[in-house]
From Swiss-Prot:
Function recorded in the entry: Essential cell division protein that may play a structural role. Probably involved in the regulation of the timing of cell division. Also required for sporulation.
Notes on the domains: The cytoplasmic region is involved in protein stability.
Extracellular topological domain: 57-117
Record protein name field: Cell division protein FtsL
Organism listed in the record: Bacillus subtilis (strain 168)
Membrane topology: Single-pass type II membrane protein
Induction comment: Transcribed at a low constant level in all growth phases. Part of the mraZ-rsmH-ftsL-pbpB operon.
Chain's gene name: ftsL
Subunit note: Monomer. Interacts with DivIB and DivIC. Interaction with DivIC stabilizes FtsL against RasP cleavage.
Any one GO cellular component localisation term in the record: plasma membrane
Amino acid sequence: MSNLAYQPEKQQRHAISPEKKVIVKKRASITLGEKVLLVLFAAAVLSVSLLIVSKAYAAYQTNIEVQKLEEQISSENKQIGDLEKSVADLSKPQRIMDIAKKNGLNLKDKKVKNIQE
């Protein structure tokens, strides 16, 4: 006996679709080319820094040498001044006359000519 009016309920099947897994590729935050450029830039900055420091040190050493030479020049100038003063003291006419009289020389006023420099 078949009942044509009878239709069995069909079970609703929920089709479980397989979830698509999205694979997210993690990119490096910095690419290899950027890393190379960064390293080259850091090396350039380091090189320039070392160059600047070395030039500053050379200038410092030169300044020290200049100061030493200036001190030496000033001491030489002082010594020259002292020697000029002693030359002036030793060449005074009165001193020369005293030494001449001490050694037995006589001054004859008629034969003496006074020469001024």
